[in-house]
UniProtKB/Swiss-Prot annotation:
The gene is HOXA7. Residues 130-189 bind DNA. This is Homeobox protein Hox-A7. GO terms for cellular component: nucleus. GO terms for molecular function: DNA-binding transcription factor activity, RNA polymerase II-specific; RNA polymerase II cis-regulatory region sequence-specific DNA binding. Residues 194-213 have a biased composition (Low complexity). It comes from Pan paniscus. Pfam families: Homeodomain.
Length: 230
């Protein structure tokens, strides 16, 4: 056999198959304008006849927005909560304005309370422009400082720190006290001349030194005030 025999035979088969598909009926998915399937019958025709009526814009169903089946009319919307909310808007606005007024009154009360607030001396700020008050020493602090001054009129930095920790004072306060005490001592001994001797180192404080400490605690020291103002 030659190859042309097989080619002619296959061609004849495919030609016969094509004729079979040409005689086949169209499937149900193809919608012809006037074709009806025998399986569906009159039901399909009835549905096709009702479709234009359902989607007709001139139908009474689309003319009235309130369907009779729901039992609602045009006046039924007056009873909805939206209408009552619209009617209550002025009242709500008045309540908001009243609340704002109450807050303003509350702020005025707070302002009056702050104006009447009492400020104590210890609550004030100690800025550089503020004049420092006069430092006062207790009886015990004055006595210990007088004892220290009796032994030595000038303190070293180390001894000043020790005395500050022992007497709960600052170094500046102790330095100011000793400076004022030295000025007072010079005024007391200026008539004695340059031969006035200082208290010997290691001497025990006498009753006169204790009495001087008590007197210094009671009287006002003008020189101390001048030093603190500087």
């Amino acid at each position: 056999m030659s190859s042309s025999y097989y080619v002619n035979a296959l061609f004849s088969k495919y030609t016969a198959g094509a004729s079979l598909f040409q005689n086949a009926e169209p499937t149900s998915c193809s919608f012809a304008p006037n074709s009806q399937r025998s399986g569906y019958g009159a039901g399909a025709g009835a549905f096709a006849s009702t479709v234009p009526g359902l989607y007709n814009v001139n139908s009474p169903l689309y003319q009235s927005p309130f369907a009779s089946g729901y039992g609602l009319g045009a006046d039924a919307y007056g009873n909805l909560p939206c209408a009552s909310y619209d009617q209550n808007i002025p009242g709500l606005c008045s309540d908001l304005a009243k609340g704002a007024c109450d807050k303003a009154d509350e702020g005025a009360l707070h302002g009056a309370a702050e104006a009447n607030f009492r400020i104590y001396p210890w609550m004030r700020s100690s800025g550089p422009d503020r004049k420092r008050g006069r430092q006062t020493y207790t009886r015990y602090q004055t006595l210990e400082l007088e004892k220290e001054f009796h032994f030595n009129r000038y303190l070293t930095r180390r001894r000043r720190i020790e005395x500050x920790h022992a007497l709960c004072l600052t170094e500046r306060q102790i330095x100011x006290w000793f400076q004022n005490r030295r000025m007072k001592w010079k005024k007391e001994h200026k008539d004695d001349g340059p031969t006035a001797a200082a208290a010997p180192e290691g001497a025990v404080p006498s009753a006169a030194a204790t009495a001087a400490a008590d007197k210094a605690d009671e009287e006002d020291d003008d020189e101390q005030e001048e030093d603190e103002e500087e």
